[in-house]
């Protein structure tokens, strides 16, 4: 049946075996493999084509016959060797003794996977046939496209089937084999429409025309034009076959005899003999074309397949590293495992305070948050200083009325200066405490994220760490608040080194003088205005001087607070929190009886780790297969 020469035949089987081996490993769960998917409308002759290729009877009948994807693996044996069959699905595998049992075994498999009815399932049934009469070829047969639901079928059975077909044919690695009866208008065939949607350029679509004996007289030339690629152009083209009809099945015409009848039909046909002569007709020619096409497709796909396997291996290793190792079963090893987990977490907590790279919690950086918050605090101090200065300038008269005592004009009362300075600085206290609480929440959030990264899959251990983090945060926040309030009590002493204050005062006076010069330039002052200014200067000299002193001192105090408040917050909420967290978590290790509870793993995490481990193993095997190919 196979007309390939010996030299090429030696190349065919290894190529197809390679992909079959990868598929049997389950690699198709991870990436798309080169394949040929067979699709067609119901009663298009799809089963007949597969029967003719495989030499065994497959489920037939009206309605949905193929209810699960059927992987048909055909292996050509040497002349004289015995027929061999095997069916496998899910975790079940069974050898088939005689070809006559194949149909029954497929029906049994479909019933187990899709139920005893008319439902469909996505799971693959694998049928392996080895015989001298089959080509080296692997096909995946998909359910026939149903237009309307019948009997006990779900109303959306058509949509279900289309979704299943789409899952296979949309992959760029799949050659779409579309079966269309000759007596149907090819342009309206649902199967071809679906193939064109995913392959608009016809790069990977091959059409098989069936039932040529049912072609109406006068339309033969149209069929010939279609096969010659003159109606709907497809790069892989068209083939035409004549398989056993129902009459021949009833008459028990054997498949080998049907092949001979097909050959005679095309050779003797008044119109279709040209298709036979061109190599576009008969099942053997189809088998040859498919085998050659699949091998060529596999060879072209191998480089990309190798790349995909390497990419998937890298991703899988990263996932396994993220989930970490599962807890050991030995009690002594469990304690070591727990100690390592906790130690790694606390060391990362310390690293957070120094900005070093973490083992867990990639991307966590508390300093970006601290820097932003502290910059806001500094900006807030500057903004309030500007408001304070403008308010003093605006309310000079009110300040004189409120604070001036028995002193004569031009005398500065230190008590007045002190009261105003204290009043302004006191307003900053609650703002500093609010900043503390904001930063405390942000730091706690980072520590919790670190705990989640470190204790993935161990909910009890994570809960214990989060409890400790929350407790330490509240305790240190209280301590930090006390320190901040003490700082503000000290600020009410109104103090600065003489040299520092004198320097600030000189700078401020120069700024004020320059501002007056700038405002006076270009203005013409009348005699009355001049007298008014003199009077104002005499009347408010004290407050003008006081304003300069207040601005100078506020600058010193705000600079001090701009540094001191962040230092207190960082020391208590970050440095001390990390050290105390390390101490508290190490105390957890002292209670050895609770290690069992702490290491109780989340079921989902354990199953995901196992799944990733299985994926890693099959990808490693797949890479080895490709390397050895």
From Swiss-Prot:
Span list, region G2 motif: 65-67
Cellular localisation: Cytoplasm
Spans annotated as G3 motif: 141-144
Composition-biased stretches (Basic and acidic residues): 506-518
Induction entry: By interferons.
Region: Disordered, residue numbers: 504-523
Annotated binding of GTP, by residue: 40-47, 141-145, 210-213
UniProt region (G4 motif), positions on chain: 210-213
InterPro entries per UniProt: Dynamin, Dynamin_GTPase, Dynamin_GTPase_CS, Dynamin_N, Dynamin_stalk, G_DYNAMIN_dom, GED, GED_dom
Domain Dynamin-type G, chain residue ranges per copy: 30-303
Superkingdom in the source lineage: Eukaryota
Key word GTP-binding present: yes
Chain segments carrying region G5 motif: 242-245
Cellular component GO terms held in the UniProt record: cytoplasm; microtubule; nucleus; plasma membrane; presynapse
One example GO MF annotation: GTP binding
Keywords in alphabetical order: Cytoplasm, GTP-binding, Nucleotide-binding
PANTHER family (alphabetical): DYNAMIN (PTHR11566), INTERFERON-INDUCED GTP-BINDING PROTEIN MX-RELATED (PTHR11566:SF225)
Designated name of the protein: Interferon-induced GTP-binding protein Mx
Gene: mx
């Amino acid at each position: 049946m196979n007309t390939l020469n010996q030299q090429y035949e030696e190349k065919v089987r290894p190529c197809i075996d390679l992909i079959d081996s990868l598929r049997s490993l389950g690699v198709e769960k991870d990436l798309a493999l080169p394949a040929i998917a067979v699709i067609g409308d119901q009663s298009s002759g799809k089963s007949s084509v597969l029967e003719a290729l495989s030499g065994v009877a497959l489920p037939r009948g009206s309605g949905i016959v193929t209810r699960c994807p059927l992987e048909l693996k055909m292996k050509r044996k040497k002349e004289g060797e015995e027929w061999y069959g095997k069916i496998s699905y899910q975790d079940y595998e069974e050898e088939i003794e005689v070809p006559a049992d194949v149909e029954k075994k497929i029906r049994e498999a479909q019933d187990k996977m899709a139920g005893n009815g008319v439902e469909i399932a996505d799971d693959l049934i694998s049928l392996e046939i080895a015989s001298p009469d089959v080509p080296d070829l692997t096909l995946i047969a998909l359910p026939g496209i149903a237009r309307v639901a019948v009997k006990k079928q779900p109303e959306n059975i058509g949509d279900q089937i289309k979704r299943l077909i789409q899952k296979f044919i949309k992959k760029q690695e799949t050659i779409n084999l579309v079966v269309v009866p000759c007596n149907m208008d090819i342009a309206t065939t649902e199967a071809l429409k679906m193939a064109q949607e995913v392959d608009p350029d016809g790069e990977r679509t091959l059409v098989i025309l069936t039932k040529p004996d049912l072609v109406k007289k006068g339309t033969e030339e149209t069929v010939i034009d279609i096969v010659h690629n003159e109606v709907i152009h497809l790069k892989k083209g068209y083939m035409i076959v004549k398989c056993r009809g129902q009459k021949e099945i009833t008459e028990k015409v054997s498949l080998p005899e049907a092949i001979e009848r097909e050959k005679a039909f095309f050779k003797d046909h008044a119109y279709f003999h040209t298709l036979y002569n061109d190599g576009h007709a008969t099942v053997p020619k189809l088998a040859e074309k498919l085998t050659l096409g699949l091998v060529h497709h596999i060879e072209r796909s191998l480089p990309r397949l190798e790349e995909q396997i390497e990419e998937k291996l890298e991703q899988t290793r990263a996932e396994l590293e993220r989930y970490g190792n599962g807890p050991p079963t030995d009690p002594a090893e469990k304690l070591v495992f727990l100690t390592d987990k906790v130690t790694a977490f606390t060391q990362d907590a310390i690293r957070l305070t120094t900005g070093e790279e973490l083992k867990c919690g990639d991307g966590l950086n508390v300093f970006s948050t601290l820097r932003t918050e502290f910059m806001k605090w500094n900006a807030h101090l500057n903004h309030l200083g500007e408001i304070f200065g403008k308010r003093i300038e605006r309310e000079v008269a009110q300040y004189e009325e409120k604070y001036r005592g028995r002193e004569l004009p031009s005398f500065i009362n230190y008590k007045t200066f002190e009261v105003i300075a204290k009043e302004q600085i006191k307003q900053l206290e609650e703002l500093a405490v609010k900043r503390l609480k904001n930063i405390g929440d942000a730091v706690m959030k980072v520590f919790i994220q670190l705990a989640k990264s470190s204790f993935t899959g161990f909910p009890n251990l994570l809960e214990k760490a989060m409890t400790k983090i929350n407790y330490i945060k509240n305790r240190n926040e209280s301590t930090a608040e006390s320190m901040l309030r003490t700082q503000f009590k000290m600020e009410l002493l109104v103090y600065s080194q003489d040299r520092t204050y004198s320097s600030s005062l000189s700078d401020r006076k120069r700024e004020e003088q320059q501002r007056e010069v700038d405002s006076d330039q270009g203005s013409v002052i009348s005699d009355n205005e001049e007298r008014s200014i003199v009077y104002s200067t005499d009347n408010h000299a004290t407050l003008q001087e006081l304003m300069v002193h207040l601005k100078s001192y506020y600058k010193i105090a705000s600079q001090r607070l701009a540094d001191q408040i962040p230092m207190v917050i960082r020391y208590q909420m970050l440095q001390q929190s990390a050290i105390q967290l390390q101490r508290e978590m190490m105390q957890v290790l002292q209670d050895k009886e609770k290690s069992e509870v702490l290491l109780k793993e989340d079921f989902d995490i354990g199953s995901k780790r196992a799944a990733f481990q299985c994926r890693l193993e099959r990808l490693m095997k797949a890479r080895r297969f490709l390397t050895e190919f």
